[in-house]
Amino acid sequence: SLLFSFQAWSSQILVPMDEAQRDHLKAYGLAYWTLENQITIDWLLNYRGGSFLIPHLQRIEEELLLRNISYQVLADGQVNKIKSEIADPEVNMEVVQLEKAPKIAVYTPPNKLPWDDAVTLVLTYAEIKYDKIYDSAIVNGILPKYDWLHLHHEDFTGQYGKFYSSARMQSWYQQEVQRSEAAAAKLGFESTAALKRAVALNIRDRKSTR
């Protein structure tokens, strides 16, 4: 942890997530980075777009400037006023304390580059750490390692997707089918459909145990 090397002041940093924020993705990445360094932050749900309240530490402020993230330094009195506003039962707001950076996995083929996938592109830009995992890792029991698994609009039927009717005779499509069947066989499954079913069941079972 870098916490003990940070110089602190008697104030807090508000990272707004409304239209005042220059870079929302980088702001989320900054929140993740802060949690990685074992510093607890407050997530102000429905307050200015779901803003973050972070201890005013010199190293954090330097990081905010480096990443060109909009922020405000607030005195304790200003912070208390905001929290009182959020606590009003007439408003739909809440303070959620965040203590730990989640371990994130994205279900995506290992040969897909970050810029070919919208989710990994966003996470890479935001500087949020993630692992790419795919079928073999899931059927071998890796899911308990992660707090959050991102799925796209996946087809777990093993039917090779929406291109079957138009591209099934194309060489690139047939090669993809062969690769998929070979990967399934290597893992001990009789077909891609059987492998995809096992993957889907692993994901479902992991979700039900959380």
Task: Annotate each language-model stretch with its function.
Residues S5-F6:
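N-terminal signal peptide c-region/cleavage motif recognized by signal peptidases
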Residues Q21, K26-L30, E36-I39, Y47-H56, ...:
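Aromatic-Pro/Gly-enriched surface loop or interdomain linker
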Residues I41-W43, Y71:
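A structural signal for short hydrophobic beta-strand segments in well-ordered beta-sheet cores
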Residues K207-T209:
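Conserved small/polar residues in nucleotide/adenosyl-binding loops
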Residues S10-K26:
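Short N-terminal segments immediately surrounding and downstream of signal-peptide cleavage
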Residues I60-V73:
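Short amphipathic alpha-helices in soluble, non-transmembrane regions
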Residues L45-Y47, L66:
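Trp/Gly-enriched beta-strand/coil motifs that build multi-repeat beta-propeller-like domains
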